């Protein structure tokens, strides 16, 4: 299966393979093992926007102990694959619905899905807590497969703003014709 193989940022054939058995081999298989991976990654890596580097691999993330959500995700995916758990990279937006607002602007986010018991489940090693409001943009083996922007020539981003709003339950129960009235 494609999501068990090494990829550009998830080097399954590295020292992480031996480490994964030591760290997680005694965990209960399935969901508990993937959650143990998320727990470890979230505790081992320090989130720091200022340390973002687009070409950081899972092994470098493990050694440097710092990174952004894509780095947390690559390391967790690599551990899963090392333990024969198919895992794929997800990129999109993650708002602050149901949690305190973050002190920094909303940005593109990364999480992963693990294939357990015949279906894919979302995990987030960076936040390591269930969240609502994910807006999935792309899936792939790692970040190399799912570039959210590709530019050509000289350019400079002038502004970038993302927001999500929770839709109230009563709004969802209105007849279709009344949707236009809400706007």
Describe every region a protein language model picked out.
Residues 1-67, 75, 143, 155-175, ...:
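Secondary-structure boundary elements
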Residues 39, 71-159:
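Hydrophobic/aromatic-rich core segments of domains that either
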Residues 183:
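Active-site neighborhood of glycoside hydrolase catalytic domains
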